[in-house]
Amino acid sequence: MSRFFVAGYNSDSSSEEEDLLSSDEELLSSSSEGEQETSDDDSLDFDDQSDSDSSDSDSDGRPSGPAYFLKKDFMKGGAGGDSDSDSEDEGRRVVKSAKDKLLDDMNESIEAINVARRSDTWTTVVSEFDKLGRLLVRAGQQSVSTPNAYIRCLADLEDYITATSENEKTEKSLNAAEARAFNMAKQRVRKQIKEYQAQYDLYRENPELFEREESVDIAAPSRSDVPVEDTTGRVLSPVFTILKQIAETRGKKNIDKYEQIKTLEDLLNDNLAKGSVFELISIYQMLLSIRFDASANQNFMPIEQWKNNEADLTSLIGLLESNKDTYQLSELGSTTDDIDIEPVANESGVKAIFGSITSLIDRLDDEFTRSLQNTDPHSIEYVQRLKDETTIYQLIVRGQSYIESITPAEVQQSVEQLSRVVLRRLEHIYYKPDQLIKANEAEAWKGISHESVIVSKDSTPAELIEGLSSFLTKHKNPVYAKHALLFSVYYYAVNNNYNRAKELFLDSQIFNKIHHADSSLQVQYNRAIVQLGLSAFRNGAVEESHKVLNEIVNSQRSKELLGQGFNSKYPNQATTVEKAKLLPFHQHINLELLECVYSTCSLLIEIPALAAATNSKDSRRKATTKSFKSKLEFHDRQFFTGPPESIKDHIVHASIALSKGDWAKAYQLLSSIKIWKLFPDNDDLLAMMKNQLQVEGLRTYIFSYKSIFSKLSLGKLSQIFELEADKVESIVQKMIETNEIGGTLDESKAFIQFASTEPQRSRLQELAIVMNEKVGLLTEKNEKTSSNGYGKKQPQQQQQQQQQQQQQQQQQKDLLQEDNSRFRYANVNTNNDEFQTTA
């Protein structure tokens, strides 16, 4: 609607409004010139006052035009003089700055705390104290010094808490909620006192200083090159001034660690020539620690920072070696009250500084492992990064040599720092063949002048492993001995010393205690038994290899059990802690090779067993591997089968050929598998497999055709299977002695004559007999059910025979279970680091 149609509007009122607008604008401009130096809070307060004044004028019924709602607040109403006079009559409002408001809020909280503690309302004390802490954080953000009232509040609270604690009657009168709040208040007050220790101590010494409003500032150390005096009155050198400043900021938020690293690097370069040994050691320790802290929240330490730390750690060890007669860095050293105080020299004149070369080496090695874990193992970057292992191993050997030289001989067996670095050295060599260990040792001992007491530099790889393991075995902590044992078993198994590895493993009885171990030990145990099984296969112990590898290959968590990945979850679902437990790729055991070895062992064991199962009794006695048998049955059900492509296809086709006695074709199929080249002794392995196929092919041939032939010529068998006549004779003789076949050798030992009293049945007849037995058992159960669970009473003699048979079967079962439990894998629980032994 047009304003000309609004009731009460005329031209006179319009002119009056224009006059009012012009007069108010003049008033506004004049007032703004006079108030240029006022704060923002004052201007806000002025707006509030003009709002209230305008609302008063509106309530007086002053005329308003159609555009009244479009006008500013100060334009509404009558002349400005009336509103000014009204506000002057009401009194000018006091305006406070943000700092003053913050201090008022803190004083209110302090007063609330004082009132609440007098009434023993500790829940209120805790809530107000937390509020006071938040206000104190805001004060720090606004560059407001710590108020004196806060220090007084801390002191008063501590005195009152101490008095309440001493008064048992008062403390016992508190209810459960107040008692919990009282304990919380006690802890938080102590924590705050430690944070403001300097102001607190000054208040206890001179309380009058804290009675005034101005905050008491504690002077901070200066960064200048002039020595400064700390709060205790000691004069600090410029080096320790900077070190102390950095040490006080460690662990706090919003600290630029890379700036601290740059500061320490400059400090180190400036003092390398002129600084004292104690100052240089302190700088090195601080610099290495800050670099590690800077990468704590990253997946791994940047390579440049890692190399800098490696170089500085090498320089630190060199500095310690050159000043070994005056300064030592050891975990056995004594701590001092402050960073700039040197420890007292011992009777030999050596000052033992508290620190740990072993911890620095461990952290550097852990960062190297994390870097490998987060690098693509199939890339060139992984290979380039792996070259740094020689550097870290040389550092480990040098660190071990230094720690040996400063550790007294009588305490070497009980000192953790020496055992840890020896274990770290063993971790880097146990999985390698002898040739690589020799190369690593030759490179590591370059530049090391003094000998090692534990193992000399000229030791062979076997002597090196034996010496390091024997040292760890003597340590009072049994964890070191277990790790050393498993590392030794793995080493001997990798280097094809199966008998020594098996002897160590069985004599230790570690399989009885492994379910109480931690995750790293469990994973190492599984790796050791897997490598033991592979070594058994390389040495021709097929049955032992099958027994060792059976459970871990058939499990669905082989990657987790060996510390090589996760079978039960996607990689992105694994936590950081779980990923840290995984081994680098170059330490992995090839799972395809593991499965190939196990399948080959199953072939050599199960094919003769299937051929020997001529009746139901034999079928029950020789239980076949279901997984292997199912593979053969699945292949038989296929209508069209092409040539073998995968490892599994080669194994199945070789099994079919061996079941027909065609050992040559079986060998040709198995030897064509390329994965055998991963073994260093590939030619010896293929020769062993050929011999095993000849022997098992002979046994399978005899089992298959004993029901057809009445006698077989040993010479003909020797010709077919390309075995010596004496060996064929010994195999046949053993089969007769173990009742695997019924027969005898003639006088000339040229023929085997089969003479079996057992009926020769076809496969259909065997199935019919099995079905008849099952029907009989079902009938007996039905008779018991019909007679309320009681069957016909058997004769006492028959009952005794059955009991004896059951006892014998139970004894055999217990012996078999005990034998199998020796090579039972450890079930690693990656969620909560619990370990169990599978049933």
UniProtKB/Swiss-Prot annotation:
Residue ranges with Acidic residues bias: 14-27, 34-58
Statement: the UniProt record of this protein carries the keyword Zinc: no
GO biological process, one term: formation of cytoplasmic translation initiation complex
Sequence ranges of Low complexity compositional bias: 794-812
Region annotation Disordered: where it falls in the sequence: 1-93, 783-839
UniProt cross-references to SMART domains, sorted A to Z: PINT
Superkingdom of origin organism: Eukaryota
Keyword Protein biosynthesis: yes
Keywords recorded for this protein, A-Z: Cytoplasm, Initiation factor, Protein biosynthesis
GO cellular component: cytoplasmic stress granule; eukaryotic 43S preinitiation complex; eukaryotic 48S preinitiation complex; eukaryotic translation initiation factor 3 complex, eIF3e; eukaryotic translation initiation factor 3 complex, eIF3m; multi-eIF complex; proteasome regulatory particle, lid subcomplex
Pfam families: eIF-3c_N, PCI
Signal peptide: none
Self-association and partners: Component of the eukaryotic translation initiation factor 3 (eIF-3) complex.
PANTHER family: EUKARYOTIC TRANSLATION INITATION FACTOR 3, SUBUNIT 8 EIF3S8 -RELATED, EUKARYOTIC TRANSLATION INITIATION FACTOR 3 SUBUNIT C-RELATED
Family label: Belongs to the eIF-3 subunit C family.
Stated name of the protein: Eukaryotic translation initiation factor 3 subunit C
Source organism of the structure: Scheffersomyces stipitis (strain ATCC 58785 / CBS 6054 / NBRC 10063 / NRRL Y-11545) (Yeast)
